[in-house]
Regions:
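Intrinsically disordered, low-complexity segments enriched in small/polar and acidic residues
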Residues: 41, 55-57, 366, 446, ...
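Well-ordered beta-strand segments characteristic of repetitive beta-sheet solenoids
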Residues: 65, 81, 109-111, 118-124, ...
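Intrinsically disordered, low-complexity regions enriched in polar/acidic and amide residues
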Residues: 11, 537, 572-573, 599
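Solvent-exposed adhesion/ligand-recognition segments of exported proteins
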Residues: 3-5, 9-11, 16, 24-286, ...
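Compositionally biased regions
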Residues: 2-5, 24, 29, 34-36, ...
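Compositionally biased, intrinsically disordered low-complexity segments enriched
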Residues: 14, 51, 302, 313, ...
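Short, T/G/N/S-enriched strand-turn elements that build extracellular solenoid repeat scaffolds
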Residues: 79-81, 107-111, 129-137, 152-159, ...
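Beta-strand-enriched accessory nucleic-acid recognition/scaffold domains that flank the catalytic cores
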Residues: 21
Length: 615
């Protein structure tokens, strides 16, 4: 009876919607979800900028992008744009199309008038976008732009069927329906965890106030720009904004030891004054060049390499404790000081310009280095500083070498080159304890040249200095040409060796050759001329042919002066001392002096002439 009824019976289902029909309704826009895997359209944006967000039949988030403008830009605005591990599909196909992530995808009804050339995904949020999966363009290839001023984090992100991928914290700039570029004020992009795979994308852009790379980036053509800038859509022009009161990041681009860039070619630009670049990982261009410019300090403790060229430029200091290598040319420019404890090399030419260079004993500066580490027969090394150039490690060149600064300190280094030029300008030149081998060596300084303990071998030696110290050093010319030293100051050759196969001519203020050797070895003559004294105690002045000595005074005690196959001539204004010394010539020997002390000395010749004027 009606009074005994406790309620109405439950309604029975009279029909059901199959999954296939429901997916078709979603694809046609009849039904849509407001979010999928963290992707939410911004309902405060104009309607023509709100994409339709749904899922494919296989459960992959799908975005039916909005109708493109006349400029081919589909402008899509979100309040959240996070991509999960399963990825997301940006539907740029008017008709049904097969995708890698989601299989068959129904056509996008918003594209009745044509597909997009650029898919702009603009995020209005206080939170960074989390990109943890691939972004696939269904249908026609397009440039994918993800712009979130709050920042972007990529952990396993990547792109499929995109001809260009752009991650930016800049505000998109639109003009007459075209995307003209990005205005960057803030925001950081981080690459972490599983990194970023843009290897199937022609061009990859990362544009932000600062960038941290703690994982790998794989790309074909990678460009990273940091700082407060206006950057054009093609990432070809960057306009630096005037400084403001906003707090600066500590580092503009930071590549950790776990991070790396692996691309065909790489261009890195940091424009913010005083904010530098730090690389502890690997930056490698497998097909092209690596270019890094910064308006702040560059620190490299990792590796930077390129198939072609490497170009590093900074307006501040540069510190390299890692490795830099170019398959073609390496160029480094620093408006500050260059501190170098690692290696800088190239297969062809290496060029360095800086205000001051300091290279440790473990450092390497090289040009003409083959892949196996051996020197080729070509490749020039040029290092130029406006201040002191100090290089204490290996300095190697398969071809020519030019080291120029206001003072050169090459002590304890190993130097090898064909035509090697050392120019210390108005400063001093030091090759103390050096090991130097060259075809032609040109050493020039307006100051003092010190080769104490150093060994220099060259086919041709050309030395210009105020004075020379070769204490326990060796200056050896191995070619057949003449060796000339013309110095306004003195020569200190104590326990040292000055030698040449050809003639040796020494013109100086004085010569201290105690326990030293000055030799014209094979077929040359020796000529020594000083306005001061020559001290040859326990030393030797020898030539295979003639010997000519003209000095204020001569001390040859326990020393040797020998013209093995020629004549000898010794002329002094003051005394000649030959105590227990030896003077000899195969031909005639002439001695003209103020006085002569030959106590227990030996004078041997084929005709002796002695003139004493009593001075």
């Amino acid at each position: 009876s009606p009074s005994s009824r406790t309620g109405y019976p439950r309604r029975q289902r009279i029909c059901r919607v199959t999954p296939l029909a429901f997916s078709l309704w979603l694809a046609s826009g009849m039904v849509h979800s407001v979010s999928a895997a963290g992707i939410v359209a911004d309902h405060g944006a104009p309607g023509h900028q709100q994409p339709t967000i749904m899922q494919t039949a296989s459960g992959i988030p799908q975005v039916n992008i909005q109708t493109p403008s006349a400029g081919g830009v589909s402008h899509n605005t979100y309040s959240q744009f996070d991509v999960g591990n399963q990825g997301v599909i940006l539907n740029n196909a008017h008709n049904n199309v097969q995708t890698q992530l989601g299989g068959m995808v129904a056509g996008n009804p918003w594209l009745a008038k044509g597909e997009a050339r650029i898919i702009l995904n603009e995020v209005n949020s206080r939170n960074p976008s989390q990109l943890n999966g691939f972004v696939e363009v269904a249908g026609k290839k397009a440039q994918v732009v993800i712009a979130n001023p709050a920042g972007i984090s990529c952990d396993g992100c990547g792109f499929i069927n995109a001809n260009r991928a752009t991650l930016t914290t800049g505000q998109p700039q639109m003009k007459n329906g075209s995307l003209t570029g990005f205005s960057v004020e803030r925001g950081e992009i981080q690459i972490t965890g599983k990194g970023m795979d843009a290897s199937r994308t022609d061009y990859t852009d990362i544009i932000a106030r600062s960038v941290k790379i703690n994982a790998g980036i794989w790309a074909q053509d990678l460009k990273v720009t940091t700082g407060r800038n206006n950057v054009d859509i093609a990432h070809g022009q960057t306009e630096k904004k005037a400084a403001d009161a906003s707090s600066q990041p500590q580092v503009a681009l930071d590549v950790s030891s776990l991070g790396g860039m692996y691309a065909g070619k790489i261009r890195l630009v940091g424009t913010e004054t005083g904010v530098g670049v730090r690389n502890a990982g690997h930056i490698g261009a497998q097909a092209g060049a690596v270019t890094l410019t910064a308006d702040g300090r560059i620190e490299n403790s990792g590796s930077i390499s390129a198939k072609t060229d490497v170009h590093l430029a900074t307006t501040r200091d540069l510190h390299n404790s890692g490795s830099v290598y170019a398959g073609q040319d390496t160029q480094i420019q620093s408006d500050g000081a260059f501190t170098h404890t690692g290696s800088v090399a190239s297969r062809r030419n290496t060029r360095i310009q800086t205000t001051r260079l300091t290279g440790s004993e473990r450092s390497l500066l090289a040009a003409g280095v083959k892949d196996d580490g051996r020197l080729a027969e070509a490749g020039n090394l040029t290092v130029s500083t406006t201040g002191v150039l100090a290089a204490h490690g290996q300095v190697l060149s398969g071809g020519n070498m030019q080291l120029k600064g206001q003072g050169l300190d090459l002590s304890n280094s190993r130097i090898q080159g064909q035509h090697t030029g050392l120019d210390a300008g108005s400063g001093n030149l030091s090759t103390q304890n050096v090991q130097l081998s060259a075809g032609t060596l040109s050493a020039r300084t307006a100051g003092h040249f010190s080769n104490n303990g150093g060994t220099i071998n060259a086919d041709t030696l050309q030395i210009s200095a105020q004075s020379l110290s070769n204490h326990r050093g060796k200056l050896i010319q191995t070619g057949t040409g003449d060796f000339s030293l013309n110095l306004p100051g003195g020569v200190d050759n104590r326990e040292g060796l000055l030698a040449a196969n050809g003639a040796v001519r020494l013109d100086a203020l004085s010569l201290d050759n105690r326990r030293g050797k000055v030799q014209a070895v094979q077929s040359g003559s020796l000529q020594v001329k000083t306005t001061g004294a020559v001290d040859n105690q326990q030393g030797s002045l020898t030539a295979s042919r003639d010997v000519r000595l003209n000095a204020q005074a001569l001390n040859n005690d326990n020393g040797l002066i020998s013209a093995a196959a020629g004549t000898g001539r010794i002329k002094t204004q003051q005394a000649v001392s030959n105590t227990e010394g030896r003077m000899e010539s195969a031909g005639r020997l002439g001695i003209s002096a103020g006085s002569l002390n030959n106590h227990q000395g030996t004078v041997v010749s084929d005709g002796l002439s002695v003139t004493l004027d009593g001075a």
